[in-house]
Amino acid sequence: MWHGTIPNLAINLQRLAEFFPDKPVMIVETAAYYSHENDPWAKPEQYAEFYPISKEGQTRFTRELVTEIKQHDNVTGLFWWFPEENAFGNNVVKGWLNRGLFDNHTGQVLPAMKEYNRFLP
């Protein structure tokens, strides 16, 4: 994780609610790897401390994130970084692979999407 852990997020969300009780908060540009295939940025040793680079790791990250932010009434938005990202014939994503919510090989929705959808009202 680039910017901290879920427990650190919880602390910051609580502080934001205390200092700015009338302000909505949105979590933006979040994502988690599901594979390190063909992606020079996805280094297993860099992220394994938090969540393994796997479909299961991405799903667990998403589940824990949604579970945490649903405990904070001031969180009104959750935006995944490039959820439609898919290498299937898409040169735009060269170097930005394996963090979307669709499998690069099949184009099918990944299990993390089910967890992501739990945020919706």
Place the predicted regions along the sequence by residue.
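Glycoside hydrolase catalytic-domain groove-lining segments
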Residues: M1-Q46, R63-K70, N74-V75
